[in-house]
Design a protein with these regions (language model features):
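Core catalytic lobe of class I
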Residues: 1-261
Length: 262
């Protein structure tokens, strides 16, 4: 239809503007997601597809429809080339998650931790496959670290020994980067904004941080209320924001006046 024809032409232009290590995120809903995926596969290449993100919607309205309620929209993530900028995204754990994931409390330091095996699957012929302190790794496994590193971990009190002499590594909560973000995004709903397609700053911050570095250029060719440009500015990125609608441009300009670079 006319929308697919329009987006097809624009996606080709966007592809040609991508940096060699750049990427693109295409946000759509259930009405066009299947066709948009096919269009993106054709334009960017099936082998450049990275992720399909399902994002919880702000106000699902499916109470009278036949079928399961639709409470998500879709973000397709493609890269320009085989390698693109990727900064692994992590989400901070809340107190309950920390206590669940790191169930042991060090009564001396007050730090929470969990323990993990010091061995990993697979046989190695080097030092990690040999005896350490008269201990061999379990059959079919090898030590995760060379002997010198194991000695250093033990010296620092980072190895916990069981009553049977089994060593395990202490992993502390305050040294954890957080929870690695997956492709189902909950609790990142759009703001209740006067602009109908306003996007959550949390969503844009997550995308921009993951796929760009400070000083990089971020572009949004359907800028709407200007969330992408506002977040890019706060994160120290350069940006381009365009839209066909005069109201969108007015809204974006007004919004960006008060944005402070981070």
């Amino acid at each position: 239809d006319s929308f697919i024809a329009m987006i097809y032409e624009r996606l080709i232009l966007m592809r040609d503007l991508l940096a060699v290590d750049g990427s693109i995120y295409v946000h759509c809903d259930w009405r066009v997601s299947g066709r948009i995926r096919l269009v993106c596969d054709e334009i960017f290449g099936v082998n450049r597809f990275i992720s399909e993100i399902a994002r919880e919607k702000t106000n699902p309205k499916n109470y009278t429809k036949l079928g399961f309620g639709n409470n998500h929209d879709t973000i397709f993530f493609y890269s320009a080339n085989q390698k693109c900028i990727w900064n692994k995204p992590f989400e901070t754990r809340d107190k309950d998650e920390i206590e669940k994931d790191f169930p042991i409390l060090d009564v001396v330091t007050g730090r929470r931790y969990k323990t993990a095996p010091l061995h990993a699957p697979g046989i190695r012929n080097g030092e990690t496959g040999t005896s350490w302190r008269k201990l061999m790794p379990p059959s079919g496994n090898h030590w995760r670290y060379i002997h010198a590193t194991l000695d250093q971990l033990d010296k620092e009190g980072r190895i916990e020994w069981s009553s049977t002499g089994n060593p395990r590594e202490r992993i502390y909560a305050d040294e954890s980067e957080g929870v690695y973000i997956q492709d189902i995004w909950l609790s990142v709903k759009d703001p209740k904004d006067s602009y109908p397609t306003a996007k959550s700053e949390v969503v844009l911050e997550r995308i921009i941080k993951a796929s760009s570095n400070e000083g990089d250029l971020v572009a949004d060719f359907f800028c709407g209320s200007g969330t992408t440009a506002a977040v890019a500015e706060k994160l120290g990125r350069k940006w381009i924001a365009t839209d066909l609608g005069k109201f969108a441009i007015h809204t974006t300009r007004k919004r960006l006046i008060g944005v402070q670079r981070g």
